[in-house]
Curated annotation (Swiss-Prot):
Protein name per UniProt: Serine--tRNA ligase
Entry keyword Cell cycle: no
Native organism: Nitrosomonas europaea (strain ATCC 19718 / CIP 103999 / KCTC 2705 / NBRC 14298)
Family: Belongs to the class-II aminoacyl-tRNA synthetase family. Type-1 seryl-tRNA synthetase subfamily.
Enzyme type, top EC level: ligase
Length: 437
């Protein structure tokens, strides 16, 4: 969420910067609400001052033994007016808050201006795509040939965009997650957290999924328990399946003041993620690239504001290290203003090479959200006895497990349809070097 004081003092600059993201700022709505707020706030302050003055007069009159009935009646009337004005002010401030919750973050000055992914900047590449002397198969064909990916049964169980992994491939998927966690905790200094997969609406508002992106989430109905918890049906019980572990990990510091000496905080979690993929109809309908349920190892850093952009570079490096250890070619892209996520001030995407597509595809997105999420969550730090300040929050995939599996299937495929296990994973696979029929 943006700083309301910044909006009031520097509105035109903010409108211009948000326009670079393709966001049309609701100027008329904001100015109308601000006008109402000022008017009602002035009225409230005037009534409070009058009531305070009248109360003093009552005290003085009583000391003198004078009749205070008229002043008492006036104060009673003022109390009713004041309550009405306070209710109006609260209603206007609520509407302002709702408007603020729908405004995206400001892009950092180092982010290139652009409309979409075609305007992103390539920062670097690592590794050389392998050349094959046989026809390359895509990951779905390889998995089905090995009888280790079953889309048909998954569709029977759950519908489209689900999959069953079996045998050696299920084991490889598990090995990947374990390898990623070990690397991040043992080499990169992250603290592993096991998080709930169901979160409340406050968590989703804190990280920016609500209220704007509710259609991308899976809400959970709990039947009789929901009715018991919410008998007046004033709103949903509020639990959703997590779209990413970023949500629970970042919200660990919601409504918290972290001592400066405890910074930075580095969290890692391996979880399933659940997304409706509402805006992706017709895209990546075959295979594991875009699923309603997928596993991801998520990295979150909570930092001092002056350290967050340095932390972003290290976060990207931590994700890159996984691909380097797996010897998978990739490139790092700096996203332009028009391609960044809602909460991000700056984002790097890491894209892995997929031979069957002859293209680099996103496998990690690493973002610095600066104070945007912290303001929504009231996540702060304090130096000694000084006034608390907002933290900066960062997140990134380290990595998406399913997409990493896709990259291994395609980059490590053999002519006979088997898959060579990357050397770094063999210890996690009981020494197995190849998966085949």
């Amino acid at each position: 969420m943006l700083d309301i004081q910044q909006l009031r003092s520097n509105l035109q600059n903010i409108i211009t910067r948000l326009a670079q993201r393709g966001y049309d700022f609701p100027v008329a709505d904001f100015e109308s609400l601000e006008s109402q707020r000022k008017s009602v706030q002035t009225l409230t302050q005037t009534l409070q001052a009058k009531r305070n003055s009248a109360s003093k007069q009552i005290g003085i009159a009583r000391q003198r033994g004078e009749d205070v009935s008229l002043i008492m009646a006036e104060v009673a009337n003022m109390g009713d007016e004041l309550k009405q004005a306070e209710n109006q002010l609260e209603a206007v401030q609520t509407r302002l808050q709702q408007l603020l919750l729908e405004i995206p973050n400001l892009p950092h000055d180092s982010v290139p201006a652009g409309k979409d992914e075609n305007d992103n900047l390539e920062m670097r590449r690592w590794g050389t795509p392998k050349t094959f002397d046989f026809p390359v198969q895509d990951h779905a064909s390889i998995g089905e040939h090995l009888k280790l990916i079953d889309f048909e049964t998954a569709a029977k169980l759950s519908g489209a965009r689900f999959s069953l992994l079996k045998g050696g491939l299920a084991r490889l998927h598990r090995a990947l997650a374990q390898f990623m966690l070990d690397t991040h905790t043992q080499e990169n200094g992250y603290n592993e957290i096991y998080v709930p997969y169901l979160v409340n609406a406050d968590c989703l508002r804190g990280t920016g999924q609500l209220p704007k992106f509710e259609q991308d989430l899976f809400a959970v109905r709990s039947g009789a328990q929901e009715e018991a918890d919410n008998p007046d049906k004033t709103g949903p019980a509020g639990l959703h399946l997590i779209p990413t572990a970023e949500v629970p990990l970042t919200n660990i510091v919601r409504n918290t003041i972290v001592p400066l000496e405890n910074l930075p905080l580095q969290f890692v979690a391996h979880t399933p993620c659940f997304r409706s993929e509402a805006g992706s109809y017709g895209r990546d309908t075959r295979g594991l690239i875009r699923q309603h349920q997928f596993d991801k190892v998520e990295l979150v850093q909570i930092t001092h504001p002056e350290k967050s952009h340095e932390a972003l570079e290290s976060l990207v490096g931590h994700a890159e290290k996984i691909l380097q250890k797996l010897e998978l070619p990739y490139r790092v892209m700096l996203l332009c203003t028009g391609d960044m996520g809602f909460s991000a001030a700056k984002t790097y995407d890491i894209e892995v090479w997929l031979p069957a597509q002859q293209a680099y595809r996103e496998i990690s997105s690493c973002s610095n959200c600066e104070a945007f999420q912290a303001r929504r969550m009231q996540a702060r730090f304090r130096k000694g006895q000084e006034k608390p300040e907002l933290l900066h929050t960062l997140n990134g995939s380290g990595l998406a497990v399913g997409r990493t599996l896709v990259a291994i299937l395609e980059n490590y495929q053999n002519e006979d349809g088997s898959i060579t296990i990357p050397e770094i994973l063999r210890a996690y696979m009981g020494g197995i070097e190849r998966i085949g029929l």
